[in-house]
Amino acid sequence: MRFKTKIKLGAAAIVGGAIAGVALNKTLDAMVQTHLSRDGITHPKQKLMSKKNQEDMANSPETILGQLFAASTPQINITIPNREGRHINALLYKQSEHSTKYAIVVHGYRSSVKAVSYLARRYFENGFNVLIPYLRAHYGSDYDYCTMGWYERFDIIDWINHIDSTVSGANIVLHGVSMGAATVMMVTGESLPTCVKCAVEDCGYTSVYDAYCYKIPKMMGLPVFAVDLFRHAIKKRIGFDIKEASALNQVRKSCTPTLFLHGDSDTVVPSSMARELYNNARCEKDILIFPDADHVMSPLSNSDKYWNKVWEFADKYLDK
């Protein structure tokens, strides 16, 4: 092969590699936009849950009662500055008579404050004021990107501090579902005021990285190693590391009593994650696995069993 020919082939390889690199970066950036941007979250291109799971959720009596509760109960929209100087928003259901009991209910990924009305109703009917924050990049938030609980944990702590500073003798229960559950666990790994009495996590994941390793290959037909490329794209675009975004590491530091709830038939976040989280938590803890429940379905298909466990657990720690 002549020298000039070798040079041409080498140059072609370099150009081809550069083009492939540009194409890969565009693909990864598109994935970030699809999964974590405001537009990707509010206008999803792919479904996380099966059609049956969605229909079961919509038709559950608990869901319907929650919708009726939201439509008939006075609500207050609250805005406070967070530690970044940005405005964060929440919906508050406030008891007509004075109550120091507060439930901070944290919604899931691609969900909303209204979608967790079935949780809000139960707490409100049990005498709690209920605060439901709008999570980053979801409807009602000013943020452009979601961090799957990692930076959201600081917003929840800012809400906790707001309640602590405005309500004398506040008793706070944290209750999150799916991404909201991971957020709650991430919160409990931080230093919290004594007004936080306990936490309830329902079908949360061990880490954002683990959640993506489980779901992205199934959703997009990609190999698991693609998650590492996605990880670096997220870090470049948004500035957080999905491996560091670990509920597992946070519960290892937690002093907040935590109840772990999960459906054993969960197709989005495997129940093995709940067992791993429970086994690693250093706080006072309890766990209940619902044998036939899919993702977020435990309180909808097993409502009596679910809430009996929640009240049994919370009553141990709330001030009498």
Describe each region flagged by the PLM:
Residues 11-81:
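An N-terminal hydrophobic leader/cap segment in hydrolases
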Residues 278-296:
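Catalytic histidine neighborhood in serine/cysteine hydrolases
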